[in-house]
């Protein structure tokens, strides 16, 4: 056991986690040169295209150290993006140490800090590593000082390497062996294994990635899942070297997979504990805290007969992505679908793309909303995540919106732009600290503003240098109202949104104009109105198409033309009473893209 090292790699987006893991795999000979591929561990097409890691992946490597002993390294590559921070905390729960990778050109960024504190909270040993020293703008001395100054861990003799060229990778491996403690656990105690991740394979059923804390899990053992109390037999156990490799047993301290032919999707939830069916452990291991979705949106299949497939797809995804929340919802405009809870906008985009790609669905999404706390005049408090569920205005005593604490790290020269942006987003400044060339600003911002387009705007005002990390702190009273869109006097439920009163004019006008472009002209006038309660705040009209009925008149009396025009008018009037307007799919998407 003292030859096992479990660690994960944490870093800000694009500081080279995945490339470093590729090098470690190559040096330890996990894959032959032919199978070696850039970013081996980012197995989803989506991850490769966007160049980001979404799911944490695990690998077991053998490393012969300089002292001649052979060590087993289990490491987990983690995502760097703020929306996936729960993936990081799950991976860290299975480790004794973490490599904090910092780009020697960019220096410390907000996510570096956030992930590092998560690791320190879990009592892990954090080992700093300066990556990308081959870059001309790399300045390892300055960055090492920055790590000590901002993060507060000793970094003067941090390993310097370049994952791209392979310089210093041996030093990284030596540091892992020396500085990360071996796992503690009792091989003779009853089995306790933590499920770090699980995914659904259509041939094998549920595949679970586990970390053995105590005891041993052998192939053919009968084990039980502690939360459901169900018993299963371990058909196969083994490790990833990135390839699936079967073994006869997983020992204490190891990380590996278990396949037990569990068919129902929620048979082995993430964060659960496995133990043996006979004389097993009494109590489960402390799991992870459940993450609460921050953003909700309605998602509907374009054709209603895809509803069943959509539900199956969501079930399979939710096994793999523990943070996904969904419940059925129906809308008069869009038919049946689901209300889905996400951790942020990137998460929402990724889930939607995965559903469309991996499960071949055509989907349409309504505007995302955050959860509001509503105090009713009757004294009860309700939580609303769908504009359609908002009670009537006269029943509401007070609306409270979620506030997040946003930590932004930005170079001095862009500070002004960032502050302007935060003020525009109704933020209040809490703190500002200068660290050399970087400034750390803390703002309290309404989550609804952060969710919409804050991240993109932050990146563009700071030329991509600012970085952001945020978490929910409390609900604050705010003057929020529901903006409805009426088409010919009928409310379209899927277009409603909850926004701050100061924005309604601007937002209403923009929406109405946008809808006017997108709704095709009919034989009668279509009135598009934006309303708050019963007050109309903006209107535009899609003009009717009309036939030139007087074309065949040649000369003659004006009353002849009048007669024809009046006849046309009558017809249009009748048509307007019975006609209904089809709102095209693009119009729903327009609501999402309003800010552009």
Swiss-Prot record:
It comes from Shewanella oneidensis (strain ATCC 700550 / JCM 31522 / CIP 106686 / LMG 19005 / NCIMB 14063 / MR-1). PANTHER family: TRANSLATION FACTOR GUF1 HOMOLOG, CHLOROPLASTIC (PTHR43512:SF4), TRANSLATION FACTOR GUF1-RELATED (PTHR43512). It is found in: Cell inner membrane. This is Elongation factor 4. Its EC number is 3.6.5.n1. It comes from the Bacteria. Keywords: Cell inner membrane, Cell membrane, GTP-binding, Hydrolase, Membrane, Nucleotide-binding, Protein biosynthesis. GTP binds at residues 14-19, 131-134. GO terms for molecular function: GTP binding; GTPase activity; guanosine tetraphosphate binding; ribosome binding; translation elongation factor activity. InterPro entries: EF-4, EFG_III/V, EFG_V-like, EFTu-like_2, G_TR_CS, LepA_C_sf, LepA_CTD, LepA_IV. Residues 2-184 form the tr-type G domain. The keyword Zinc-finger does not apply. SMART domains: EFG_C (SM00838). Required for accurate and efficient protein synthesis under certain stress conditions. May act as a fidelity factor of the translation reaction, by catalyzing a one-codon backward translocation of tRNAs on improperly translocated ribosomes. Back-translocation proceeds from a post-translocation (POST) complex to a pre-translocation (PRE) complex, thus giving elongation factor G a second chance to translocate the tRNAs correctly. Binds to ribosomes in a GTP-dependent manner. CDD domains: EF4_II, EF4_III, LepA, lepA_C.
């Amino acid at each position: 056991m003292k030859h096992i090292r479990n660690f994960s790699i944490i870093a800000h987006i694009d500081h080279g986690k995945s490339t470093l893991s590729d090098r470690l795999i190559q040096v330890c000979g996990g894959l032959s040169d032919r199978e070696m591929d850039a970013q081996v561990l980012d197995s989803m097409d989506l991850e490769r295209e966007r160049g980001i890691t979404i799911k944490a992946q695990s690998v077991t490597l053998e490393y012969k150290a300089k002292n001649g002993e052979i060590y087993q390294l289990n490491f987990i590559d983690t995502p760097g993006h703020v929306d996936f921070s729960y993936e990081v905390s799950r991976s860290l729960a299975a480790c004794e140490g973490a490599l904090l990778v910092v780009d020697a050109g960019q220096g410390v960024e907000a996510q570096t800090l956030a992930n590092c504190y998560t690791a320190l909270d879990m009592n892990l040993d954090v080992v700093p590593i300066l990556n990308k020293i081959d870059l001309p703008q790399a300045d390892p001395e300055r960055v090492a000082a920055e790590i000590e100054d901002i993060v507060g861990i000793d970094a003067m003799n941090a390993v310097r390497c370049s994952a791209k060229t392979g310089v210093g990778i041996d030093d990284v491996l030596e540091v892992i062996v020396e500085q990360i403690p071996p796992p503690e656990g009792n091989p003779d105690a009853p089995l306790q294994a933590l499920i770090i991740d699980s995914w659904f394979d259509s041939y094998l059923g549920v595949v679970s990635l586990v970390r053995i804390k105590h005891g041993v899990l052998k192939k053919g053992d009968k084990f039980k899942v502690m939360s459901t109390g169900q018993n299963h037999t371990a058909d196969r156990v083994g490790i990833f070297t990135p390839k699936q490799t079967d073994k006869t047993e997983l020992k204490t301290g190891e990380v590996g997979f278990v396949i037990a032919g569990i068919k129902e999707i929620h048979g082995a939830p993430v964060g659960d504990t496995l133990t043996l069916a006979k004389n097993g452990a009494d109590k489960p291991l402390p799991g992870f805290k459940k993450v609460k979705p921050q953003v909700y949106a309605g998602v509907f299949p374009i054709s209603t007969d895809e509803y069943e497939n959509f539900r199956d797809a969501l079930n399979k995804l939710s096994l793999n992505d523990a943070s996904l929340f969904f419940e059925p919802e129906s809308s008069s405009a869009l038919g049946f679908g689901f209300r889905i809870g996400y951790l942020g906008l990137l998460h929402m985009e990724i889930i939607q793309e995965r559903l469309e790609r991996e499960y071949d669905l055509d989907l349409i999404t309504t505007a995302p909303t955050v959860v509001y706390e509503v105090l009713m005049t009757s004294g009860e408090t309700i939580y609303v995540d769908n504009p359609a569920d908002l009670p009537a205005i006269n029943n509401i005593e007070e609306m409270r919106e979620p506030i997040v604490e946003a930590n932004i790290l930005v170079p001095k020269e862009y500070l002004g732009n960032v502050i302007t942006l935060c003020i525009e987003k109704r933020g209040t400044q809490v703190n500002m600290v200068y660290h050399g060339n970087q400034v750390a600003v803390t703002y309290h911002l309404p989550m609804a503003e952060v969710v919409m387009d804050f991240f993109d705007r932050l990146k563009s005002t700071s030329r991509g240098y600012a970085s952001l990390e945020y978490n929910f702190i409390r609900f604050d009273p705010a003057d929020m109202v529901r903006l409805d869109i009426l088409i010919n006097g009928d409310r379209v439920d899927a277009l409603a949104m909850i926004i701050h009163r100061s924005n309604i004019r601007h937002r209403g006008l923009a929406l109405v104009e946008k809808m006017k472009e997108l709704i095709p002209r009919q034989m009668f006038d279509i009135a598009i109105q934006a309303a708050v309660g019963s007050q109309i705040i903006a209107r535009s009209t899609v003009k009717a198409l009309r036939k030139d009925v007087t074309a065949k008149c040649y000369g003659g009396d004006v009353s002849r033309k009048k007669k024809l025009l009046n006849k046309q008018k009558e017809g249009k009037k009748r048509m307007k009473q019975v006609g209904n307007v089809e709102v095209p799919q693009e119009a729903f998407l327009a609501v999402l893209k309003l800010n552009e």
